[in-house]
Amino acid sequence: MVNIGAFSGKTIVKPLREALGNEGLITLNYFSASMTFLALLAIWFFYKSAQHSGEGKTFGQIWNALIKVCSNGRLITLIIIITGFWMVQHQLYATMPKYVLRLAGEGASPSWYANVNPLVVVLTVNLVTQMMRKRTALTSMTVGMFIMPISALCMASGNMLDGNTNILGMHPVAFMMVVGIVFQGLAETFISPRFLEYFSLQAPKGEEGLYLGFSHLHSFLSSIFGFGLPGFLLSKYCPEPTLFASHEEWLTASANAHYIWYYFGAIA
């Protein structure tokens, strides 16, 4: 459901931006906030859980469970590793749009390129899960971790190709970005489902839900670092073109723009 929502939401970004300009992106945020609020109301008033065991924990119990998770070296190591994975995933929104628009031109469609990720996940997750069903969760996640650097290298390679030669009608930067996103989506199908499975298996009986909640500590960490680092990297390697007196000066300043993806390849 998450990936279906991710796909459908990004589909309307490009036409909205073309119709309303950057003002359309602000309107889209209002729309998203409104729909999220309606979903919250729907859950509050209409969702009734048939399973109530384990509910009603005190803040003290929750705090003690958090301490247990943070003192488990295996779980903390896994959270840090998965944080690196999601830092790279977040670049679909933190780095990729500006990177593509600045290097491939305003005619590029970064919102549609980002849609490749949920599309790949929806199409392949059942196949990958079936293929890896007899393998351990750690084995499946390890395969995904090996795929992620390939994704970053594909994204970097676009800037090293001749920008005057299109590939399937697309600028090389845009085309290789899509290829990288395909690998990124494939890596996610190996990692995300089995990560939750592994985390739940480490939980004491009856506290699986609580531990699954703490498994999302990686979301907190990856959002902070994943959206903080790109600002520095874009300023250094792929700066805003309007800051330069001429296009030639900007070309010189952004010649190594693909270095950005080397950083994320190392993180992955």
What are these regions (language model features)?
Residues 1, 165-191:
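Hydrophobic core of transmembrane alpha-helices in multi-pass small-molecule transporters
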Residues 1-17, 33-36, 114-118, 214-230:
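Glycine-rich segments within core transmembrane alpha-helices of 12-TM secondary carriers
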